[in-house]
């Protein structure tokens, strides 16, 4: 029986349209193989939306996304729009999309692929077998807390203020996502906070600990954020799933990403309690290589696989895509960002063709 899904495509800026085209071709192939019908709707976001409509997130785009089963995003931003005020820049489109879809959980995997292990800056024995999922709270914490701003005191001195705030319900909902994620993986969850200094972290630790009683099959541990950062570099294989707040997650997810050696290989997902999630590569829009057929489409393709797994409940189709990625790497196919001696240098389109062949053979 054919299953039908409505997918909003947001190619965005820079290399976005190129890598999105590869991901769509891959989805069409697995759709045929698994009797899945995709209804793709393309919409504007970021710089492309600014050029066309004057705003980074047109209301029509948000409406289209809300009516979808999932949103696949490519890349946002570029030098062209850097002179705009911060609230008018392309990146504001992503923030607006997250808020409009009420997405509060960001899932960032960091997995060492055997074929690329030497790309890591750490020793092989340290990173071999690393497979981490960072679950970051996305809409609370110090980035959104109030009061905030730069004020002038009675003495005329400038004073900058930001406020880290979390409510019990905000902690509980991200905690549930993290426990459920850990349950589907290796059953280990590490909660990262700064409870030895911050009151908000004491509440965080208390709520996560209480929530763990509902998940007796998941092993819970706690680390202070400074120790967690050190342990990610010293012994990353100890981690399975990490859950943490917005600020700490912003930092730790990038640190975990660089264990892999190439940010161009990493997908991500942003999820809410209901409604469509947004799936996108971690890397930026790379305007310097846009249109030159040099982009690495693999993170975009792996983001499509995450979409199949987490939004559409199609784990077998997701597995098929992930295995195809491993296969093309195993046969030595590389784009410039992951190229090494003796490998086959391919452009974006040719890498897509190689993926299609791998999917059709398997």
Swiss-Prot record:
Pathway: Amino-acid biosynthesis; L-leucine biosynthesis; L-leucine from 3-methyl-2-oxobutanoate: step 3/4. GO terms for cellular component: cytosol. It is found in: Cytoplasm. The keyword Metal-binding applies. Keywords: Amino-acid biosynthesis, Branched-chain amino acid biosynthesis, Cytoplasm, Leucine biosynthesis, Magnesium, Manganese, Metal-binding, NAD, Oxidoreductase. It catalyses: (2R,3S)-3-isopropylmalate + NAD(+) = 4-methyl-2-oxopentanoate + CO2 + NADH. The record marks 143, 194 as: Important for catalysis. It comes from the Bacteria. One of its GO terms (biological process) is L-leucine biosynthetic process. Mg(2+) binds at residues 226, 250, 254. InterPro entries: IsoCit/isopropylmalate_DH_CS, IsoPropMal-DH-like_dom, Isopropylmalate_DH. Catalyzes the oxidation of 3-carboxy-2-hydroxy-4-methylpentanoate (3-isopropylmalate) to 3-carboxy-4-methyl-2-oxopentanoate. The product decarboxylates to 4-methyl-2 oxopentanoate. HAMAP family: LeuB_type1. This is 3-isopropylmalate dehydrogenase. The lineage of its organism: Bacteria, Bacillati, Cyanobacteriota, Cyanophyceae, Nostocales. The gene is leuB.
